[in-house]
Amino acid sequence: RIAAELIKYASNAFLATKITFINEIANLCEKTNINIDDISIGMGLDERIGSRFLRAGPAYGGSCFPKDTKAITSTAEKFKTNLSVIKSVIKSNNNRSKLLLKRIYQILNNKIKNKKISFLGVTFKANTDDMRDSSSLTMIPTLSKKGALIKYFDPTGYKNDFNKIKNVSFVSSIKKSVEGADLIII
């Protein structure tokens, strides 16, 4: 039984590592003015690496990666083994939303109050209605508390998690979400 669990944990930890790796490379690309998509495509052409899970974006979330990366490090600790790479992945991923918020503040010159911000997609990945550990769960309330006026659209029609947050509204189309926006977050 433990082998099957460890296979699942290790597989998901590896995929989480790939996502976190490309997000860190995206940070470097931003500083060096290189397009991360070009890097992702080039890396993906290498058969040893492959193109899946090499798309820079928000922190990983969902029901598996956060849970399984924590589970494998917990299992390792029980057996007095240090999984420093996976611990670093967890730490980097946890910092990703903070880094994205910092970029938003920079783009808007720290003037968040009354800025119209559009979120296109709020789930942890495309084509799902799963909000578990989605970056938007951190970012939207934080921006709202600073006075941003937020509209969001998600093609899955997801609209429940933000209903009670001041200055946040679900809209029924991309067009309505981006109309008059000072900043669009995809």
Task: Pin down the residues of each PLM region.
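Structural/interface elements that position substrates and couple domains in central-metabolism enzymes
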Residues: 1-186
